[in-house]
Amino acid sequence: MNWAKELFKVEKPIIGMLHLGALPGDPRYKYENSLDKLVKLARKDLLALIEGGVDGVLISNEFSFPYQRKMDFITVAAMARIIGEIKSDISIPFGVDAISDGSATLELACAVDADFCRGTFSGVYVGDGGLYDNDFSKLLRRKTELHLDKLKMLYFINPESDRNLDTRSLSEIAKSTVFKAGADGLCVSANAAGEDVDDNLLKLVKDAVAETLVLANTGCKPSTIKEKLKFADAAVVGTYFKEDGKLQDENGNNVRIDSNRVKKLMDVVYQIRKDLE
């Protein structure tokens, strides 16, 4: 867990989500909106997150609905282009998540020299997209081949919107994932983005893997972040940071980051850190 303090330079780091809009090949992509426009919007959101004071940023293809288990080349290529063009503006640690495709996430992290990545790297799940499993034995061997020794991997252990077919308790899954995969961090989520993650689940996982970073992955806002960080070591915040706290507008378009909302949550976090001193 010491790696997080070394990387983010603070206790209880807050990672802000940078949601990319629909990309070429995605059903929601509008071809009149060029990649140049997506780059411009991504840069705007990035600067709003940094201005608001987050400790890290996680870039994902949030609007590539429906998500692919085996991502098309164009999707990860578009992500790499956007990240490459805004990278000079990234002044804090950053990570990537090519949603639902662990291999694409790892390859992308290598290509853009990310500090960390997040994904569904382990387990067997069922959801709207059907049945899928994840083979971290191949993934970790690929990580070795790519010499990604410094890349930190944050594992979902109860992915949003899908059900884990593993009948073991979440605490057993947490222990096993850390032991077998050497997970650098475990992300604990609610059933969907923006929904409040159960404090009891956070405590359960943290008690099971006391020496591993545990992140509150959904539903964090100023009124709840103090309680979440009693059990979690860090938090990933996405929906709350957006204008009016909405993931998307009435037309299904990506909503922009509001730096004032970022500052509001971070002010609470600064006080939490003072209380820890």
Residue positions per predicted region:
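Glycine-rich, proline-tolerant flexible connector loops at the mouths of alpha/beta enzymes
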Residues: 50-78, 124-129, 183-196, 245-250
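Alpha-helix-loop-beta-strand connector modules within alpha/beta enzyme cores
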Residues: 10-11, 16-17, 68-96, 134-154, ...
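Conserved, mostly hydrophobic/aromatic
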Residues: 16, 49, 57, 117, ...
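Conserved anion-binding
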Residues: 23, 104, 110-185
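Active-site mouth loops of central-metabolism enzymes
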Residues: 19-44, 94-101, 155-171, 220-221
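Short loop-to-alpha-helix "cap/lid" segments that border enzyme active sites
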Residues: 168-185, 193-211
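Hydrophobic faces of well-ordered beta-strands that scaffold small-molecule active sites
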Residues: 14-18, 57-59, 94-97, 117-119, ...
